[in-house]
Swiss-Prot record:
The lineage of its organism: Bacteria, Pseudomonadati, Pseudomonadota, Gammaproteobacteria, Enterobacterales. Belongs to the SlyA family. PROSITE patterns: HTH_MARR_2. This is Transcriptional regulator SlyA. Keywords: Activator, Antibiotic biosynthesis, DNA-binding, Repressor, Transcription, Transcription regulation. It comes from Photorhabdus laumondii subsp. laumondii (strain DSM 15139 / CIP 105565 / TT01) (Photorhabdus luminescens subsp. laumondii). Homodimer. SUPFAM superfamilies: Winged helix' DNA-binding domain. Residues 49-72 bind DNA. Residues 2-135 form the HTH marR-type domain. Transcription regulator that can specifically activate or repress expression of target genes. Regulates the cpm operon, which contains cpmA, cpmB, cpmC, cpmD, cpmE, cpmF, cpmG and cpmH, involved in carbapenem-like antibiotic production.
Amino acid sequence: MESTLGSDLARLVRIWRALIDYRLKPLELTQTHWVTLYNISRLPQEQSQIQLAKAIGIEQPSLVRTLDQLEEKKLITRHTCANDRRAKRIKLTEDSASVIRELDGVIESTRNEILGGISREELAFLSTLVQKLEQNIIQLQSR
């Protein structure tokens, strides 16, 4: 019988993300918005869109729509890089700090609820397995 681990993991990510999106809906934000804001807030100031896309692990064109939405919500600003007119620098606005705190609170409480009833040891073991799977995949990709 064929293993369904890949499908199981994909489904888990899909329903986890759907729950986050549902819980962020009152804030008129999504999990994608949160991931983007989270990464912007943790990277050195005024990263380029290219650097941000690499940090998130997506292609730059995929990021542009999310950045457009965040700019419309006045959570970020973008301006042309002085050294390279093709590059755009991203900066969080003052308004974004309180929104990011609120987002982080929703994400953290949701994570705690999802992981309820799972021991620290079980989580550590799961994390080790996921890291091993990731290493195996990276090695296979480099062949």
